[in-house]
Amino acid sequence: FLFGTAPNAWLCAHAGAWQPGQRVLCVADGEGRNSVWLASRGLDVEAFDISDVGVAKARALAAEQGVSVNFAVSDCDAYAWTPGAYDGVAAIFVQFADPAMRARLFANLIRCLKPGGTLVLQGYTPKQLDYRTGGPPHVSHLYTQPMLREAFAELDIVELREYEAELAEGSGHCGHSALVGLVARRR
């Protein structure tokens, strides 16, 4: 598992925003570490990723953990974003998108939340290019607080902060990292 099987720490710290039985979407969920963990907490989880290999590994992880997740193979543009369908959306390190695709993706994250629904998002900041411990090599794919504040202006920002931390998320995210985390609620 490129990013390990344990859930992301930012997600763990903020998953209390969702209660058992609520519907949560995990965007670009890779090999399933976050969706499987959320399902183990009693959430009704849907997840998608562009990689059929990643989704196959996610399905195997869910079976191993004895949980049910509705997985789909899709890219972000082709995914069937249902307006107002989710109590929560988890977007953890969804940083493969250039600025135009990112704008479409962020609009869909907002649109698919129910009123009162919560978005939990984490990504790398441009300072991450100094550390090279994970993430994309393109500054245009990285996040800043002002970018996120502007992109999610129609949501109520619960928490938005840039910080540094040691990540140990498989070989894909390993070492000192420059991060930004967002928790926001749809009005």
Regions flagged by a language model, labelled:
Residues Y79-G88:
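A short acidic, Gly/Pro-enriched loop at the edge of an enzyme's catalytic core
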Residues F96-L109:
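A short, conserved alpha-helix within the catalytic core of class I
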Residues G116-Y124:
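Conserved beta-strand signature within the Rossmann-like core of class I S-adenosyl-L-methionine
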Residues S140-R161:
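Short alpha-helix
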